[in-house]
Amino acid sequence: MDGKRFLRAVSYCLLCIGFTTSLINCGAQEAPSVTIQGSISEDTTWTADNIYVLDQETRVINGATLTIEPGTLIKATPGEYPNASMLLITKGSKINAVGTPEKPIVFTSSDDNITRVEESNQSLLNENNKGLWGGIIILGGAPISTENRDISTFYVGLDPSDKSNYYGGNNVEDNSGVMKYVSIRYGGTYMGTGSESNGLTLCGVGNKTQIDQIEVYANQDDGIEFFGGTVNASNLLVYSSGDDGIDLDEGYSGEIKNIMVVLGEQSDSGIEISGGQGAFQGDFSLSNVQLTVQTPSEDQQIMRIDSASKGSISTVLASNFSDASKIQLQSSQVALQQLQISKNQTQVNSLSEINGGKENSKNITFSSGLSLENDSKGYNWTLTKQMVSR
């Protein structure tokens, strides 16, 4: 090869290398940040080519709809009540957050180093980084059952003088939008009056709302709490919550299918259920429930069900709990069917594992070799799956 041809070849190679490097750099470029604060009063879309930063409370009001594209990353600045960062959907407004297994929608803390949803497994935060922001709260107009016997009430931690902070009503089919393939991480900040926020809080939400494929990772309080309402939900995964995995209260009357709760060292119960406190009790249904523990502790309970609860729980597989862990059943109106409990890998088939339930034994059945529909493969998109597979 003569000198000129050699130089042209080298130049071409360098050009190719430079072009390839440029493509790589462009692919890794951090998306621009958009700070969000205050109220959203008209239909708005958050796109995947931005990182949205919630700075204190962001609320959707006046019947507006917030649409969030698949693969969008939302971060929230740290802070406690009254400066806690959170996303609040008020009654009559909607959230349309529909991700995919390949492009989930991720809510996390601004302390999280990730700059793209695809970098989730590179986060420097872990399950001990709880309580960094306020989570997501949805206020709907479906029936609730509260102490004041009113059809509506305000969410604790919000200003009771502001009527947009109220939830509940008579609309069983109330529609607050859609949430699907959404991961909510490191929430549960202090909200005043001795309480912390949940990862996802559903207050009086109606059954036209769609809740499916939701992950709550390392929240300081409950993972997901239902305050009354009639909303149905499916494919819920809660990992290492500071309190309960799933909590039902105020006469929740919906159906939840496919639940997986992985308790951490600070967790309390896999599931806690409190009945209605007002004119009606509600009537819930839970099915295909998998509860397990990373490190067994005497303080962890499998389930707590109070005396005012009414509903059914079927096909429950609880594993790896300590010998001191029990199901606390105080209600004669809750049926527990197809329970399989193992403690320290020992199969349990005895009512002695259920406190307060002996007089209600007709509502309790044990099974073995249960097969659950909520196989862990369905959660391959989650941060939980990525972290436990390391």
Where are these regions (language model features)?
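Bacterial Sec-dependent N-terminal signal peptides
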Residues: 2-5, 18-38
